[in-house]
Amino acid sequence: MNNCDFSGYATRNDLACGDGRVIRKNAFSDNDGRTVPLVWNHNHTNPEAVIGHALLENRADGVYAYGTFNDTEEGKRAKMLVQHGDVRSLSIWAKILKQVGSDVIHGDIKELSLVLAGANPGAYVDFVMAHGVDEEDELFASYDENIMLHHSAEQDEKKETNSQQKEENKDE
């Protein structure tokens, strides 16, 4: 989703949350495609705490969210904190939970919060997008992704070594 400001897991399946609950696969499948308010730290008493909205996507391993900040001062401040990597945790507020023991098997997500520390260890921002005027001005930053960097000289050396080994094998 290109017009979002960030994305990440709102909640991940099969992880023990801080409150002892475990979200199970498809527990929030009814929320797929739904847009919910993006709130600062689950603050439901102050309308200024609404800092944007999030589009939810049910996946096999949890619920993924595409977040967009609003243009309020609070939204701009939260956007800056996320872009700088200062705040990365996400947390859902859900109602109508159905549980079997500690397993959550169904629920209705009412909001997604940007929090300092979330209950679900897999719920965090993993991608940030900075919008520019032109498409070329866009910046994508990914967190916690394994990125391998190779210097072109290393690849040339590797090709040369492979060629030499092939030549040696022909001579034998």
Which sequence ranges carry the predicted segments?
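Short, Lys/Arg-enriched N-terminal segments with co-localized hydrophobic residues
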Residues: K166-K170
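Residue microenvironments linked to proteolytic maturation
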Residues: N3-G8, D14-C17, P37, H53-H151
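Short Gly/aromatic-enriched secondary-structure transition segments
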Residues: D19-N31
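Active-site loop/turn microenvironments that scaffold catalytic and metal-binding pockets
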Residues: N31, N43-A49, L56-D61
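Short conserved beta-strand and strand-loop elements enriched in small hydrophobics
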Residues: R34-T45, L90
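Short, surface-exposed beta-strand-loop junctions and turns on beta-sheet-rich folds
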Residues: I23-R24, T45, D71-E73
